[in-house]
Amino acid sequence: MLYVRDKVNDIYSHSAEIRSVSEDASKPVRTMAVRMVTPTPTQSNEQIVVNVPNVRKPVPLFILMRALGLVSDKEIIETCILDMGKNKDFIDMFIPSVHDAGKIFNRTNALQYIATFTKGKTIPHVLDILSNYLLPHIGEMNFREKALFLGHMTFEMLMVARGMKKPTDRDSFRFKRVELPGTLIYDLFKEYYTLQQRHVFQ
């Protein structure tokens, strides 16, 4: 379920957040968020950043998109707003994010940049994070599909930022996650099985 919020905190003005569950039941739930930086009296900000699991620092949107294989600014913006003609009013909202990507214009540099904020500090480690930790419900090596979903999250957030959509009402039953009995029993069994293993090996 995608949750879009406004007035997040002093650092971020808007965010789009999702809990992503892999089809592989052995893998834990991963949480990811796309956020817009709040303007300050001295800086206009409003660049878009992404919180990626196992990456210590929020990654600028355009750098993450390049790491996923989309290189040009136009291709990245089209992935986010889909129709450049119909949604041309949104294009200017990406200007701070274009500048935020700095001098990183290709995939290799993007992967190297992200690697500096990971434990492994290598490109293979970053690729492992993008495969297994970023939006695992989409699949492991489906980088193009992950970029499209990331673009969808960004567009939903921008529409709330422009007042074209309301933020998600988390109290509404429409947005409540219903856990099925099988899932609940699996989680309970896993918890007690882990405890039993600890007692056995003590």
Describe the residue ranges of each PLM region.
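N-terminal non-catalytic structural scaffold regions of very large proteins
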Residues: 1-202
